[in-house]
Amino acid sequence: MKNSIKTAVLGLAALVSGFSACNDADYDTLGVHAFVSESASNKSTKVTITELGADAEITACLSEAATKDVKLKFVVDSEVLDRYNQKQASSFLVLPEEVYEMDSEVTIKAGEFSAPATKIHIKPLPKEYVGESYALPLRLVSADGSVPVTSVTSTYVLSLIHI
C-alpha cells in the first residue's frame, strides 16, 4: 500500500513537471529564413518535355515578411542531384545549361513573403541528348547574405521525362 501511494505521488509529480517544464521555451530561434515553397511538400517534380519543350516554375519564400529587399539566387547543384539519385536509386544526369533558360536571381521585396515565381523553360532536347535521363537540381542561396536559407527546404529537383 505504501509503495502504491509513493508510486502515485511520483507519477503525479512527473506529470505536473512535464506540463510546466517548457513555459519559457524560445520558439523563435530560426528567425527569418528563406526556402523553396515547392520543397515544403515535395523534394522533386516530374516535368514532361515534348517537341515544344516544357515550362516549370519554382518560388523563393521567406518565413516572415521581408523588412527590406532580399536578394536570392537559384543555382544548379550537382551534389543535390547526387543525393537525389542515391535516395531514388536513379541515375539522372544534370541537364546541360544550353537546354534550359531561367532567371536565377530573384528579389523578395520589403513587406512581402515571396518573390514572383521563377519561370524555367526547357528547350526541346537535341538528338544527342535523347536516350539519357536528365534532371535540373536547384538550390536556393542567399545572393546578398541578408537572410539565411534553410538546409531542409532549400533544394528542389525537376526530373525530366522526354516523350
Task: Report the location of each language-model feature.
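Beta-sheet-dominated interaction scaffolds and their linkers
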Residues: 27-62
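Bacterial N-terminal signal peptides that target proteins for export
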Residues: 1-9
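Short beta-strand and strand-turn-strand segments in soluble, beta-rich domains
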Residues: 84-106
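C-terminal motif of bacterial Sec signal peptides marking the signal peptidase cleavage site
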Residues: 18-21
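Short glycine/proline/serine/threonine-rich loop/turn segments at secondary-structure transition edges
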Residues: 126-135
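Short proline/glycine- and polar residue-rich coil/turn motifs
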Residues: 107-114
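Conserved small/polar residues in nucleotide/adenosyl-binding loops
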Residues: 161-163
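Beta-sandwich strand segments
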Residues: 144-156
